[in-house]
Amino acid sequence: MSRDDQLFTLWGKLNDRQKDNFLKWMKAFDVEKTYQKTSGDIFNDDFFDIFGDRLITHHFSSTQALTKTLFEHAFNDSLNESGVISSLAESRTNPGHDITIDSIKVALKTEAAKNISKSYIHVSKWMELGKGEWILELLLERFLEHLENYERIFTLRYFKISEYKFSYQLVEIPKSLLLEAKNAKLEIMSGSKQSPKPGYGYVLDENENKKFSLYFDGGAERKLQIKHLNLEHCIVHGVWDFILPPP
């Protein structure tokens, strides 16, 4: 039975409500959209089409950005469907890589804040810092050890431009850039009322300009954030732009 025959047969089995939902879902693929491959060595043209279709399928039933877990699965499925060998890490609480692509361990991040910057990346939770000693030098060492668990890092950034217009951006954060944190200038925020007191690790270029900051958050989660990471130091692999029709 051909694909068209299968669709016709299935259509006849749906009730009116299911047919209405099916039509809405099909119309999702007819939205105004642009998929741009801008750089990179892993992804082929098929991946950008497949992943873009998965993004629009998600937004057929949700007004929220793709969560990290949904990103991981959509990313992995799109890679495999496009002919790239990929598999998710077996443990979802793995303190390192999230996915393996052609035998390369990769960490995945997402960013979807309402006030997201076009020029600077912010990762609100890079890793948990645990309940050990709160000494910035030791925390920095833990971050550098964490980097040993993966070779590449990709973050999916979501921009809501208007009620019906949104965009996704796939960016690679070079591991070599993050490794520059070994020379970070550490500063404890002594005036903070938080306990333990938070601190910063500033990564500067040769002209003392800030490349990015490590923020050791001493709050309830005790986590490491990456702040003010200039997009100019990263690789934008692709952009997906969508304009949805009004309901």
UniProtKB/Swiss-Prot annotation:
InterPro entries: SmaI. Its cofactor is Mg(2+); K(+). The keyword Hydrolase applies. It is an enzyme of class 3 (hydrolase). Its EC number is 3.1.21.4. Pfam families: SmaI. One of its GO terms (biological process) is DNA restriction-modification system. Keywords: Endonuclease, Hydrolase, Magnesium, Nuclease, Restriction system. The keyword Iron does not apply. One of its GO terms (molecular function) is type II site-specific deoxyribonuclease activity. It catalyses: Endonucleolytic cleavage of DNA to give specific double-stranded fragments with terminal 5'-phosphates. This is Type II restriction enzyme SmaI.
